[in-house]
Structure formats: C-alpha cells, structure tokens
C-alpha cells in the first residue's frame, strides 16, 4: 500500500524568519508550470509569497519560494506551497516491486484557518509565529539537496527540533477530492511530485518507532483515517501552532 519508507535524521534545524523576502515572478518554464498548476487547483492567485534569501541557502542551491493561498469556502484552510525544490534532480531510488520514486518534488503544507497569517512585509503588526511552520516546510524542501537523497511519500524526517514539532512526515494530500494536485506535468511524460508536509511531534514519532514495521501506517492514519477497504473516513491534516 505504501512505498518502502525510511526514517531520516536531518541536520540541526534553524528558524529562517530573518531570511524572508517577497518574490512573485517565476524564473523558469518549470516554475511557471508549477505556479499555474497551483492556481488551477486552488482556483485563485496566491495572496503573497516568501522567498529564502541566498545567504541562508546551502551553497549552490537555488532559491525556494513559498506561495501562500488563503482559506476559501471550498478549501477552508491555508495552503503553503513551494516552488524551487524541484530544481534539484534527486538520485534514483528503488521503492519496491520494480518501481522507482520520482526524482523531482515540491511540497505543500495545510494550516488551520484559525492561525493568523499575514504578509510580514506589508503589515508591521503581523504575527510571525506562523513562520515557524513555513520554516519547517522549507527545511523539508532543502533536505534532498543537503543530503543528496531522494525522499518520497511516507518518509519521516526527524529534524531534531525543540518545540511542538520535531519533524515531518510526507503524505499524499487526500484532503483534495481529486488526485490531480500530486502531479504537475512539465512535459508529456515528465512530472513533478507534490507531497503534503505534515508536522509531527516527538511523541508521535516515538510511538511510530515503537510500532516498527507497522509504524508508518499507524502514523499516516493519524492524519488520514481509512476503513478496511481503504476508503477515507476522516481527516485531521492541518498544522496548528
């Protein structure tokens, strides 16, 4: 049901709030396709974007942008979506049964509508606590480049963070009624995978590890719960502060 998964330990995590500026223009054909893909899926333009400054990026890594989409009646939650992670072509990875993981990823995080998210460049009184969630999203997006690794759905990343969340698990974004969101085609046969980054607590990660082989299924079911026929029956896929 799930790919062969792995637990990943990341380099020490740093909050990147000071490395934020605003960027809207896309700089490549691939990035423009991603931008258009997000707009099509969400039915609107992002309300603002955040970009990692080059001085906080690993050497030779291209900048990563977060597009911020507001809650709507149809999708009543915040959507934070990356553009730029897929510029890195990940190494090949065998995921079993003769299959290989895709080699270009982008990432998205869904945040509760109760969280106050405003553009810090436009509003000097805007809260900044939500930027810690965006930093977790960026750290996930940086991981494959930093480690020269391939990450895919069901992987968990332990970032060694002190606080509410210690890392993240990669999920399929089942909150959407259509699976189209998970693939952005850049040509007829090539696509970018888009996975949901779900923050996890140290308690959840510890329980997952104790369950060993069945741990990843248990962990993923905490956010998207299925019946015996694997039909989605409930979901709690939103990050909170």
Predicted features by range, described:
Residues 2-82, 87-90, 98-103, 108-241:
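Acidic, proline/glycine-rich low-complexity IDRs
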């Amino acid at each position: 049901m799930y790919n062969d998964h792995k637990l990943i330990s990341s380099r020490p995590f740093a909050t990147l709030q000071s490395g934020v500026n605003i960027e809207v223009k896309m700089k490549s054909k691939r990035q423009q396709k991603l931008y258009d893909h997000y707009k099509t899926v969400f039915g609107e333009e992002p309300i603002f974007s955040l970009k990692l400054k080059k001085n906080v990026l690993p050497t030779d890594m291209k900048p990563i942008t977060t597009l911020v989409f507001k809650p709507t009646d149809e999708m009543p939650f915040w959507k934070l979506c990356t553009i730029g992670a897929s510029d890195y072509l990940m190494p090949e990875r065998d995921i079993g049964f003769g299959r290989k993981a895709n080699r270009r990823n982008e990432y998205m995080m869904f945040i509760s509508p109760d969280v106050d998210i405003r553009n810090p460049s436009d509003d000097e009184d805007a809260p900044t606590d939500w930027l810690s969630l965006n930093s977790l999203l960026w750290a996930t997006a940086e991981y494959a480049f930093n480690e020269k690794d391939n990450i895919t759905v069901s992987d968990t990343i332990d970032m060694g963070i002190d606080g509410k969340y210690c890392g993240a698990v990669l999920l399929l974004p089942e909150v959407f009624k259509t699976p189209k969101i998970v693939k952005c085609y850049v040509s007829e046969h090539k696509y970018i995978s888009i996975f949901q980054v779900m923050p996890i607590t140290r308690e959840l990660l510890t329980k997952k590890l104790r369950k060993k082989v069945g741990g990843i299924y248990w962990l993923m079911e905490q956010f998207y719960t299925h019946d015996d026929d694997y039909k989605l029956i409930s979901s709690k896929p939103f990050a909170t502060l």
